[in-house]
Amino acid sequence: DYTIVVQTSTGPLQLNKITSFKSKQDVTDVRVKRLDGITDHVRFFDGWSGSFDIERQDAAVDRFFAGLEQGYYSGINEQPAQIYETIQEANGAVSQFRYDGVLMTLADAGNRAGDATVKQSINFVASRRILVS
């Protein structure tokens, strides 16, 4: 069982029906070729990125991103968000991770059709993912 909470600078962003959540660690791998012919590798951690899909229930997501865009054109710097990922493990334990320095983009505002729900996609980048518990 997963719970995702998005905390923005203006309060929590209510995402009522999250249908998928995906994240990955971003790294840069640098190859160092030594004079003796052996290749060493140096890894630099470059944060995290991911996406989540939701079923549109109300205008919360649309209003949030409209506010970000309005702020941008008004010269207001975007404040990063946080994502809290809580996992109920199979053995009953609870794991919680926090993504810091999160910037989100509305990758897909959804397709409107007469006989279907509206699926929206949000992409994100984060500075770090920290184990909380």
Per-segment meaning from a language model:
Residues 66-98:
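Short, acidic/charged, Gly/Pro-enriched secondary-structure junctions
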Residues 1-64, 94-121, 131:
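Solvent-exposed edge beta-strands and adjacent loop segments
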Residues 126-128:
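Residues on the solvent-exposed faces and adjacent turns
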